[in-house]
Amino acid sequence: MKSIKVGVCGVGNVGGAVLENLSNSPEIVENNGGVKIDVIQVGARKGKSAVSFDLNVTTELLDVANNPEVEVLIELIGGCDLAKDLVETSIRNGKHIVTANKALIATHGDELFELAKEHNVQIGFEASVAGGTPVIKALREGLVANKVNWFAGILNGTTTVSYTHLTLPTICSV
């Protein structure tokens, strides 16, 4: 089975859950994806927050982006400035990217996708749009015979939850 060496940056709520799932249930990824994920380095601004995972932890996030063994960088730190530097450095170093960072994709997506294209790497960002609904996969794979030039809509989890609550009888009753 093929093995992919991964670096994870960010161990907050999302990053911590990702590390926990990869550590506690690796067989799910192996069985569903046909690949073994080896987390070889973790970048955590507060190093102690990642100690419970018994992994190679650094507080210097760019060390993960510059680690020649890391093949895929999972960016889960949030925000724009540091995340952009981290992703750009990783792409320039030939690493594929996975991110759940809505702000990063909304603000710098076009330039990051162009940089990724130049360096022949992929950016996975499905978790950063539409509240995790697999809309990107549907557009890329399900509509492959169609030419989609532009797509607009309110596609985020917060708005979806808000609209759901507005339609509930308990909210609308007087």
Located regions from the model:
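Short catalytic-loop micro-motif centered on adjacent basic/acidic residues
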Residues: 74-75, 97-100, 123-126, 150
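Rossmann-like NAD(P)H-binding beta-loop-alpha module
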Residues: 124-166
